[in-house]
């Protein structure tokens, strides 16, 4: 990582900084997307194992999920979601429980294995 040290008085500093996406903010947003019937677009999505697992979990529930080469994720929830979250997917990451609130809000019933 580059580091810049600025000494003394300066008139102004300006520029652009690229911030990498964070898994810990992306997973709750993916889970919350279940609440929306329109498409949800997430940009700068980190392609780490938990994000891919959550993508597969959403697909298993009935969502359509696309990820572009520019790390933009499009989630579509036009059809009703299944009420049962597959144990195989939930058991590989703790973030699977994040879907509970969204599924309860959308369908008033949910089954999850813990």
What would you call each of these model-derived segments?
Residues 1-114:
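Short, structured segments at the rim of ligand-binding sites
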